[in-house]
Amino acid sequence: MTEFWDNEPSPLQTIDNPFLDKFGIRLFVKRDDLLHQEVSGNKWRKLKYNILGAKQNNFVSLLTFGGAYSNHIAATAAAGKLFNLQTIGIIRGDELTPYSNPTLKRATENGMKLIFVSRAEYEGKMELAQKYGQSSYVLPEGGTNLLAARGASEIMDEIVSQLGCYPNYVTVPVATGGTFAGLCTKSTLQTRVLGFTVIKNGEYLLPQINDTIATFGNPDETNYEIFWDFHCGGYAKTTPELLNFIDRFQTQTGIEIEPIYSGKMFYWLYELINRNGDYFEPNQTIVAIHTGGLQGKPKQSLVL
């Protein structure tokens, strides 16, 4: 089973663009979207040590939580199928069905039992876990826990090995904060980790992020910033400007991105670069993490 997690490091792709040259920026994309067709991106990283732990402790099922477009739900279902683990997904929104969108449909096809609950019920996750999966290995919403952060921290190790040095900046979208926190545990004062939240009012994530950093590293040596208001209206919401940017970015780079996670990160990263040195000084090296999430892109109906 461990062979599955022994992939070669995901590619580090250079972005050549006159826009970046104008500001003296070297931009690389860490292509975690290429790690696996279904268990891809940061979900591959976050599930790694959780799946290994579940198997080593002889669990036969996984239970987790998520929303209608949750990449974590889709990836957990796929991983469960790969490793012969039953999967249960508690889904926020009792108006939904297993065929409401491609994400839920694919999770169902991969054998996940979906349980739809009201938004009020969803807040009682501990009670739901006890009710529907007493003997299951429980993964939190988004898969974010200490084992997930451990897996995500390995992204920084790969970046440093591939570049031969620490970059000036590493950027990542933030939904539950696990990948961001993992990167921060391996950052140094010379590398600033930038997080772009994809949800409204995400400040509640900060205590858990800081606790994770304190568990694995030295908070005094952590250099990071989170942009709390760069979410384009909230989770799974878009703007015409965002969608137009995604079209241009894909045409110029050949890299497919989606509008819920990585698309927002790249959009706002380019906006920061375009501020003519107000944020990024010239001659900086930036590595942007592509966290995958393409599984539900083709037919998702997003809110403008």
Please annotate each region the language model reported.
Residues 1-304:
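PLP-dependent amino-acid enzyme catalytic core
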